[in-house]
Curated annotation (Swiss-Prot):
Quaternary structure annotation from Swiss-Prot or TrEMBL: NDH-1 can be composed of about 15 different subunits; different subcomplexes with different compositions have been identified which probably have different functions.
Chain's gene name: ndhM
Origin: domain of life: Bacteria
InterPro entries: NdhM
Catalytic function, reaction form: a plastoquinone + NADH + (n+1) H(+)(in) = a plastoquinol + NAD(+) + n H(+)(out); a plastoquinone + NADPH + (n+1) H(+)(in) = a plastoquinol + NADP(+) + n H(+)(out)
HAMAP family for this protein: NDH1_NDH1M (MF_01352)
The enzyme's E.C. designation: 7.1.1.-
Name this protein carries in UniProt: NAD(P)H-quinone oxidoreductase subunit M
Family: Belongs to the complex I NdhM subunit family.
GO-annotated cellular components: plasma membrane-derived thylakoid membrane
Residues in coiled coil: none
Primary localization: membrane
The keyword Ribosomal protein belongs to this UniProt entry's keyword annotation: no
Amino acid sequence: MENATLLKSTTRHIRIFAAEIDRDGELVPSNQVLTLDIDPDNEFNWNEDALQKIYRKFDELVEASSGADLTDYNLRRIGSDLEHYLRSLLQKGEISYNLSARVTNYSLGLPQVAVEDK
């Protein structure tokens, strides 16, 4: 695919590329493959169950968009919906902030701290 434009959606914690990753780790634009990068800055602590929930939600959103043109707008909509879903996982306590991250900016709200009754 020569001179193809790389379509992408980038939110704080979700990046989607209309591309494949080649053997050298480079993105190669594609109209057939979407590549998902979750939490590229390692801002959160993840478990396998939470990651699988994100992947399933991504698959669900892509399936709901099947038949629509592959555009920046459609990718941004999927990315935005995934970002909101990630926030819901944080609010439910299924993921947590990584306090050892390079930067702790609490971009989805301050951490919840359980207080014991005395």
